């Protein structure tokens, strides 16, 4: 009787263990299927957004330029003229004729201006138009290359708060830097260098730092929607509040 009981108990233990193992496999399989089913949708969204950002930067960055404002100074004991950098900023190619748009405060007071393209070629530039009341300036580079790349124009009147934006520029002299964010607000007012009020300005949380001035603000289609021009920051560095002049205003100048 004892042997029979012992055999019966062993059989029951083995049977229950097998059942438990099967249930565990089924449960784990179900969880794995759930994770696998959920993962592609999330990863696909992230990948699409990243791919969009990467593609925009790849296409737009060749149109972004480095603008250097220089002063000329004659040496005390020689007739040689020295070039003293007074400041720098960003600009972008407006058309294939070599017109460059930037901020007025980037080029103000310059005795010589140079524009460096993405291929590192440096070109002298002349000022052909300014609108201090809008903090805008237009330059023309000498001997523009045939392969100058421009930016497609968007319509800033169609912007909505929350839309994705991208800023490309040269903050602190670090050329071709990309930052991203959203449209934080529309219709802001800021002061131009002429102390006149610029209305209808775009506010964004995309990082804009000294050196970004004059660079393009783009939408998720890679279209130009604004010119980065100012930040609100007690420290002078980005505090998540940047401003851009709408492209529709630029087109009117």
Task: Report residues per predicted region.
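Short, linear, compositionally biased motifs with a strong N-terminal bias
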Residues: 11-14
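C-terminal motif of bacterial Sec signal peptides marking the signal peptidase cleavage site
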Residues: 16-18
């Amino acid at each position: 009787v004892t042997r029979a009981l012992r055999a019966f108990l062993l059989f029951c233990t083995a049977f229950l263990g097998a059942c438990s193992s099967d249930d565990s496999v089924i449960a784990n399989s179900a969880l794995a299927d759930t994770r696998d089913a959920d993962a592609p949708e999330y990863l696909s969204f992230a990948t699409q957004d990243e791919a969009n950002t990467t593609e925009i930067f790849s296409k737009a960055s060749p149109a972004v330029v480095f603008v250097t404002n220089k002063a000329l100074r004659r040496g005390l004991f020689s007739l040689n003229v020295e070039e003293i950098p007074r400041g720098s900023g960003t600009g972008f190619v407006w058309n294939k004729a070599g017109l460059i748009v930037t901020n007025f405060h980037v080029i103000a007071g310059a005795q010589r201006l140079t524009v460096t393209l993405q291929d590192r070629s440096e070109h002298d530039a002349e000022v052909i138009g300014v609108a201090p009341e809008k903090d805008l300036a237009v330059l023309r580079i000498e001997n523009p290359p045939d392969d100058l790349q421009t930016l497609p124009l968007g319509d800033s009147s169609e912007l909505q708060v929350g839309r994705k934006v991208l800023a490309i520029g040269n903050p602190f002299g670090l050329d071709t830097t990309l930052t991203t964010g959203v449209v934080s607000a529309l219709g802001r007012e800021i002061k131009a260098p002429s102390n006149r009020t610029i209305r209808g300005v775009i506010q964004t949380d995309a990082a804009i730092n000294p050196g970004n001035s004059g660079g393009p603000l783009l939408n998720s289609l890679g279209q130009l929607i604004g010119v980065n021009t100012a930040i609100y920051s007690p420290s002078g560095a980005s505090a998540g509040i940047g401003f851009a002049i709408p492209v529709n205003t630029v087109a009117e100048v």
